[in-house]
Swiss-Prot record:
Pfam families: Seryl_tRNA_N, tRNA-synt_2b
UniProt similarity note: Belongs to the class-II aminoacyl-tRNA synthetase family. Type-1 seryl-tRNA synthetase subfamily.
GO molecular function term, any single one: serine-tRNA ligase activity
Function: Catalyzes the attachment of serine to tRNA(Ser). Is also probably able to aminoacylate tRNA(Sec) with serine, to form the misacylated tRNA L-seryl-tRNA(Sec), which will be further converted into selenocysteinyl-tRNA(Sec).
Top-level EC class: ligase
EC number: 6.1.1.11
Superkingdom of source: Eukaryota
Protein name from the UniProt record: Serine--tRNA ligase, mitochondrial
Organism: Schizosaccharomyces pombe (strain 972 / ATCC 24843)
NCBIfam families associated with the record: serS
Coiled coil (residue ranges): none
Quaternary structure note: Homodimer. The tRNA molecule probably binds across the dimer.
UniProt binding sites for ATP: 317-319, 404-407
Length: 479
């Protein structure tokens, strides 16, 4: 499918400035690796439009939602949010009459011809100026505190989401059945790939949890990536190759805020900036969701129903504390290739779009002949931005358990309020809803394909859908 500049421009409509409407599709994927170190987050350099009224009027439900998501510290701030809103209103009620009085006295000074009376009015105006400045400082601090507390409040949770920790996940559907029986000859993906997955040299070059893929494994990685992109394009998703470096405030607006130090996933860049120039810090993306969401930053979509994009990029994650047998090999890397779906929809369409993304993921996994299951994930497993999340887990024979390969989230207007992404139609206007989903997390799909399609002779049968991309029916077959 060939995507012209005109078609891409039509796809985005009036949402982007004309200078950003051009697009050149690259059939060959080029990956740029970037060095980084970790520092701390900065606050956003713009103001999100938060729903203070909802939090105030539904404080008990908001607090319960935080507790259900295992965000006890944030739950404890909800009463403080209510008191700050009350305090701000009270201060404004005192402040505005002072402003009116100050304005009236200024007019009286201009009209006054009596020097003595004028002197009294000037002194009174000075006193009012000092008072209004003090009120301004207090209101500014209260407003900022209120904003920071509310910014940390997670999205509302849809009623269909199970309440509790990970073990409360509900199996919605199973896909296929195990192809490989557990026998003495069963191998894990590292044993199957042999030198095709080189962790040792990568550890010397980059550190723990990096890898080189070579030979048939490198071909398999490129085949899955290209197939995932073609699969998405055939279903109406517009291809994008996004930047892998974004501003940290963009990542924060998307909901990538750490619950604690160990949960922090973001690599921030430690780069020189001039003391004379104030510029936001940057970070490496953990998923293309972040840079794709930024396409809608401060934009208004006109004549809007939905927009759908699919991005391919490298992804970078710190994965702090991720060790152990289940995380060995390709399962949990600091850097990997990922194909991501992202959609903006009218609020009335987000539920339908969520189902479309999950069905896309299910069909994609089915075409690779990978046994899997679809899970409705519970509250404690939801990120701050998600109102619901479905995961697909693939059966991984060597570990005799399932491992996550995709996730899909409906973020409602959480990200749109923080990124100022709106829509305007003839009949209504407001904030869009955003959704995201994994099309292909390449390393884990490699694990699933190698282990589920391994043969007794040590080869791996290539799923039929990948044969046109890899140009062979078996991997590791002697020539």
């Amino acid at each position: 499918m060939r995507l012209t500049n005109r078609r891409f421009s039509t796809f985005l409509g009036n949402a982007l400035p004309s200078k950003k409407k051009g697009f050149i599709f690259m059939s060959q994927l080029l990956y740029l690796r970037t060095f980084s170190t970790h520092t701390s987050y900065l606050r956003s350099s713009w103001q999100a439009i938060l729903n203070y009224k909802y939090i105030y009027q539904n404080a008990e439900a908001v607090q319960r939602n935080c507790i259900n998501r295992n965000l006890q510290a944030i739950a404890e701030t909800v009463p403080k949010i209510r008191s700050l809103i009350d305090e701000k209103e009270s201060l404004k009620n005192e402040f505005f009459p002072l402003l009116s009085l100050k304005k009236e006295i200024t007019l009286q000074i201009e009209r006054c011809s009596d020097p003595n009376e004028r002197g009294k009015l000037v002194n009174e105006a000075k006193g009012l100026k000092k008072k209004t400045e003090e009120y301004n400082k207090i209101i500014s601090k209260v407003t900022n505190d209120l904003y920071q507390y509310c910014l940390a409040v997670p999205n509302t949770t849809l009623p269909t989401v199970p309440v509790g920790p990970e073990d409360k996940a509900v199996v919605v559907q199973k896909i296929g059945s195990p192809l490989v029986k557990k026998t003495g000859s069963l191998k894990d993906h590292l044993q199957i790939a042999n030198e095709g997955i080189n962790l040792e040299d990568a550890a010397q070059a980059s550190g723990h949890s990096f890898c080189y893929t070579t030979g048939d494994i490198a071909l398999l990685e490129m085949a899955i990536t290209n197939y995932a992109m073609d699969f998405a394009i055939s279903k109406g998703w517009c291809p994008v190759i996004p930047p892998t470096i974004v501003r940290t405030d963009i990542a924060l607006a998307c909901g990538f805020q750490p619950r604690d130090e160990e949960g922090q996933q973001i690599y921030e860049l430690d780069s020189y900036t001039s003391p004379l120039v104030s510029s936001p810090k940057q970070c490496l993306i953990g998923t293309a969701e972040i840079s794709l969401a930024a396409l809608g930053f401060k934009k208004t979509f006109n004549n809007f129903t939905e927009r759908k994009v699919v991005g391919v990029s490298r992804a970078y994650r710190r994965e702090a504390g991720a060790r152990g047998k289940e995380n060995r090999g390709l399962y949990r890397l600091h850097e990997f290739t990922k194909v991501e779906l992202f959609a903006w929809t009218h609020p009335s369409r987000s539920s339908e779009m969520f189902n479309e993304i999950v069905n896309f993921q299910k069909e994609f996994v089915e075409t690779l002949k990978i046994p899997a299951r679809i899970l409705n994930m519970p509250t404690a497993e939801l990120g701050s931005s998600a109102s619901q999340k479905y995961d697909i887990e693939a059966w991984m024979p060597a570990r005799q358990s399932y491992g996550e390969i995709t996730s899909a989230s409906n973020c409602l207007e959480y990200q749109a309020r923080r990124l100022l992404t709106r829509y305007r139609n003839d009949k209504d206007s407001g904030f869009v809803h955003t959704l995201n989903g994994t099309a292909a997390a390449i390393p884990r799909l490699i694990i699933a394909i190698l282990e589920n399609h391994q043969q007794e002779d040590g080869t791996v049968k290539v799923p039929e859908t990948l044969v046109p991309y890899i140009h062979k029916e078996y991997l590791f077959k002697a020539k």
